[in-house]
Amino acid sequence: MPVASSEYQNEHYASFATTSRLVTCLVSETLVPVFFVPVKSVDRNNQFIGLCLLLRPTTVKQESELPTNITASDILTVVPLRGLPILNNERVALFNGIRCPQIDLVDFLDMLPHIYSVESSGSLKSGDSLKQKTFDTLSAILDGNKTFDLVDGYSAVQLWNHFAQDLEINSKLREQIGQELGSSILFQKYTYDNPKPLPTLNSSTIKWEQSVVEGHATHPMHKARKSFPPMPPLNPGSYDLDHPAVRLVGIPRENAILRGEYEELSAPLVNALMDAGGNHKDIRAQYQNYVFIAIHELQLPNIQEKFKDAVIFSKEHQLNVEALASLRSVARPDILPGLSVKLCLGIKISSALRTVTPFTTYFGPGFSFNVVPKLTYDHEVLAIERELGTITYRHEDSDVAKHCSSVIREALEYDPKYQDDLFIPCGALVEKIQRPDTDETLVAHVWNLDTKEKRVEFLDRYVDFALRSFLPPCLINGVAFEAHGQNTLARFDRKTGLLKGFVIRDFGGVKAHNETLKKSAGVELDILPDSCVEAHSLEEVFKLLYHTLFHCQLQRLIRVLDLHYSGEGWEIVRKYLTQYVPKDHVMWPMFMESSKVPGKCLVRMKIDELYRDYIYRPVPNMIKYEPQSVPEAI
C-alpha cells in the first residue's frame, strides 16, 4: 500500500496537476503568446533548461504579431522547464538580444512542478535555487523596472481569472469555469490524500479501472466532479464514486424508447434490484405496463424533478455496483457476467454532464448489429464491445431525455471465459503509482521496465497492435473509434504479461464517413438528425483518430517510457504507419507529411460552451517529431 505524501505536498501537486494542464491548453490553442526563454547555462543537476513564458493576451494586437519588448506586467505566468517543449524556430522573438522561439506545444511532463505568478509591485523574496534561476533568466529579457517577485503555486483558478479578465469573458461563464477548475484541484488533492493499493497482473480489471490518479493528461478539468441543482453539492469524500448504489426506477412503457435487447439483458440486474426489497415476480405483475431501469443514486433528484410519471422505488431496492474509469459506467460481474452498464450521471466530469443522450442510445444498437459485423479489422488483435440494448425516456427535448437513459454493453473483461486474460484501461497504464511526487508509472512498475531495451520492446509491440487494431476500419471503412485511454482496454496474458491485443468500447464518440462505409461494407449509418457521428469528410474521421489514438494514447505511453525526447518512440510509430498505411491513401499526407494536424481545443470549446461540436486548431504533428536541441540564449 503506497504511503500518502504530506498534505501540504498534495495541495501543491494538486494545484500543479490542474494548472499545468490549463497552461498546456493555453499554449496549444494559441490563446496567448508563449515563448521559450533559454537559460544561460543548463544545470543538469536540477534539470532546469529554461522557461515557458506565457504573456497576457493583450500583449499583441494580432495573433501573428511577435512582441518586441516586454515588462513584468505583460506576463501571465512563467513555468520552469525540465524538458524541451515543441518549438517553432520560424517564429522567434528577440527580447534584450535573447532569442526566444515560440512554443507550439508543451506537456505537463516538460515542466518542473512550479508555476509562478509575477508580482510586479514587489521585490524578490528569498526562495530556493530554482526560484532564483527562474528570476535571473526572466530578468534578462525584461525591459523597464526589473523589481518584481515570483510567487509559486499559482493556481488554475487564479490563472483562469487573470486570462478571462484580459479576454473580457462574461462574468457568469468566467465564474462557472473557475468553479470547475477549483473542483478539479480539490478532487485531485483528495485522490493524492487517499492512495489505493497498487494493482498487479493478478488484480481484477475493476481494480485497474479504479487506479486512475490524475486522469486526462491535457484537460484542465481532468478531475472535476461538479453537480448542479436539484442534485446536492458534491465534495471530495462526500460520496463513494467508486462503489455507487443504483436504484430501481419504473417508466411507463409508452414513455420508454427501447433499442436492441435492453429488457432481456437488463433483466438480471432489474430482478436483483426488485428482490433486494421484495419479490421480482410480484413487482413485475403489479407494474405490467412499466419498463425498468437502474439509476445512479446521485441522479435520483433529476429523475424526480424531470420525470413526474417515473416510479422511484424505495431505498430497499438498491444495490452497490463497481464504477469504471468514466465513473458513470458500472459493472456487477456476479449479476451481469460479460456486460457493463452505462448510466446517466448529471455531474460535470471534465468536458460535460455525464448523461446519455438519445443520439447515443439510438445509434449504439444499430451500429452494433448492422455495421460492426461488416467492418474490416483484425479480429485476432481487436475486440469491439457492442452496445446491445438501450433505453431512453421519450421526451421531445433531448436535453431532458438524456437524464433518464442507459446502455447495456458487452464487456469481455467480465466474462468468465476470458479469466486468463487481464484487461486494463490504457489510460491506467500511464498513471503514477498513487503518488504525486514521482515519475514512476504503473506500466513501468508492474512490467518491471527498468531498462531502455525493455521499454522499447514493450512500446514496439504496443504500437504494432494498436495500429493493426484501429487503422483498418479507418483506412477501409471510413470509421474512427474514439480510441483514447479510457475507451481502449489493453489485453494481456495474466501469466506472462504479454500484450495480446485491444478492446474498444463506447460508440458515443465514433466518427464515420457514410459514403466510404457504404462503398466498402455495403451498409449505412442509422442515426438521428443532427447526430455528430456522421463525418462530412474523411479528414474529420482522421482528425478524431489522431486526437484519440496518437495524441491522447500513444503520446502518453511514449512520454512515460522516456522515449519521447530522443525521438525513438515516434520512430516506432512511423515504422508501423509506413507498414500499414498505403502511400497513395489520403491518410498518408495528413499523418506522414504534414507538419501540423488539427488539434482539439478543449478550452476554446469551454469558452464557446460547446460539447458535441468540436473546435480544432493546427498543432504540431507528433508523428513527425524529431529530437530538438536546447536553443542557446544568445
UniProtKB/Swiss-Prot annotation:
It is an enzyme of class 6 (ligase). Its EC number is 6.-.-.-. InterPro entries: Aerobactin_biosyn_IucA/IucC_N, IucA/IucC-like_C, LucA/IucC-like. The keyword Ligase applies. Induction: Expression is repressed in iron-replete media. NRPS-independent siderophore synthetase that catalyzes the rhizoferrin biosynthesis from citrate and diaminobutane via an ATP-dependent condensation of citrate with diaminobutane followed by the addition of a second citrate to the monocitryl-diaminobutane intermediate. Can also use as substrates the citrate and diaminobutane homologs oxaloacetic acid, diaminopropane, diaminobutane, diaminopentane, tricarballylic acid, hydroxylamine and ornithine. It comes from Rhizopus delemar (strain RA 99-880 / ATCC MYA-4621 / FGSC 9543 / NRRL 43880) (Mucormycosis agent). It holds the Pfam family FhuF. GO terms for molecular function: acid-amino acid ligase activity. This is NRPS-independent siderophore synthetase rfs. The gene is rfs. One of its GO terms (biological process) is siderophore biosynthetic process. The lineage of its organism: Eukaryota, Fungi, Fungi incertae sedis, Mucoromycota, Mucoromycotina. It comes from the Eukaryota. Changing R354A: Does not affect the catalytic activity. Changing L544R: Enables to accommodate serine in place of diaminobutane in the active site and significantly increases the catalytic activity. Keywords: Ligase.
